């Protein structure tokens, strides 16, 4: 929740989106933590890539 709150504080009206938490399609490298359910892919609700670090 702290990351989502930080996003809302930095950019009012923008929400954090989790786009993938488990990879069953093989989109990540073989060593990816997505296969263990220990990684997530995130974006912002406005999908403004200039906000991504």
UniProtKB/Swiss-Prot annotation:
UniProt: Zn(2+) binding residues: 34, 41
GO cellular component, one term: plasma membrane
Modification(s) after translation: The C-terminal domain displays an autoproteolysis activity and a cholesterol transferase activity. Both activities result in the cleavage of the full-length protein and covalent attachment of a cholesterol moiety to the C-terminal of the newly generated N-terminal fragment (N-product). This covalent modification appears to play an essential role in restricting the spatial distribution of the protein activity to the cell surface. The N-product is the active species in both local and long-range signaling, whereas the C-product has no signaling activity.
Keyword Metal-binding set for record: yes
Residues given in the record as Ca(2+) 2 binding sites: 20, 23, 25
SUPFAM superfamilies assigned to the protein according to its UniProt record, in alphabetical order: Hedgehog/DD-peptidase
Principal subcellular localization: membrane
Compartments where located: Cell membrane; Secreted, Extracellular space
Keyword Membrane: yes
Residues the record lists as binding Ca(2+) 1: 19-20
Keywords attached to this entry: Autocatalytic cleavage, Calcium, Cell membrane, Developmental protein, Hydrolase, Membrane, Metal-binding, Protease, Secreted, Zinc
One GO molecular-function entry: calcium ion binding
UniProt superkingdom: Eukaryota
Any one Gene Ontology BP term: cell fate specification
Similarity comment text for this entry: Belongs to the hedgehog family.
The protein's role, per its UniProt record: Intercellular signal essential for a variety of patterning events during development. Involved in dorso-ventral patterning of the brain and in early patterning of the developing eyes.
Entries under PANTHER family matching the protein: HEDGEHOG (PTHR11889), PROTEIN HEDGEHOG (PTHR11889:SF31)
Stated name of the protein: Tiggy-winkle hedgehog protein
Species, as recorded: Pseudorasbora parva
Lineage, top ranks: Eukaryota, Metazoa, Chordata, Craniata, Vertebrata
